[in-house]
């Protein structure tokens, strides 16, 4: 099933990132650039680095100049994330281009790639919650609460994986059809962001 392929690659990316556990480490994609595996690995690596950017920027003692630079990195990462999701949707559009929708076929609330995006973020939540359950410096109460949260996340993974696979099955059978809207990110576009527009003139 596609969800298992995706999740396994996300987990591989997360584990590899945490060997060095450094947002500045070089990115090396082990998968051929012409494959969906390549896109999935890249997607999760972007998410994993951004997860840790978000940790760093919440440091109460962070230097304001460093925080500003980091905020710009987060903005760039968000754009990269969105672009990668759209590449993944392009893969699905190509996969199902010859499918004729059935009469009465319906549209989903989100495209397959945005469900993949949520699965990638969920993998990160599961990894870090699992780390919390293994802390030796935490109270028993903290460990117990995190174990409960981990069980909820694992159930969410099961449900989301099933929903994603069912969506892809429905698209392949013509019961649903894909309709993709390019995300209109406004904050990085000087034509749409009034502050950037002011500086551009």
Where are these regions (language model features)?
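Anionic, Ser/Thr-rich low-complexity intrinsically disordered regions
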Residues: 1-201
């Amino acid at each position: 099933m596609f969800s298992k392929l995706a999740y396994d690659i996300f987990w591989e990316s997360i584990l590899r990132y945490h060997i060095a556990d450094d947002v500045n480490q070089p990115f090396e994609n082990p998968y051929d650039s012409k494959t969906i595996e390549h896109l999935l690995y890249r997607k999760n690596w972007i998410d994993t680095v951004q997860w840790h950017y978000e940790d760093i920027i919440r440091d109460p003692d962070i230097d304001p100049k460093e925080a500003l630079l980091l905020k710009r990195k987060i903005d760039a990462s968000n754009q990269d994330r969105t672009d990668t999701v759209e590449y993944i949707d392009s893969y699905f559009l190509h996969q199902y281009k010859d499918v004729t929708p059935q009469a009465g076929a319906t549209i989903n609330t989100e495209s397959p790639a945005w469900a993949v995006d949520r699965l990638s973020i969920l993998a990160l939540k599961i990894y870090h919650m699992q780390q919390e359950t293994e802390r030796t410096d935490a109270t028993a109460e903290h460990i117990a609460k995190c174990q409960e949260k981990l069980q909820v996340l694992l159930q969410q993974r099961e449900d989301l994986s099933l929903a994603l696979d069912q969506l892809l099955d429905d698209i392949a059978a013509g019961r649903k059809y894909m309709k993709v809207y390019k995300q209109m990110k406004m904050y990085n576009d000087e034509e749409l962001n009034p502050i950037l527009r002011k500086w551009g003139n």
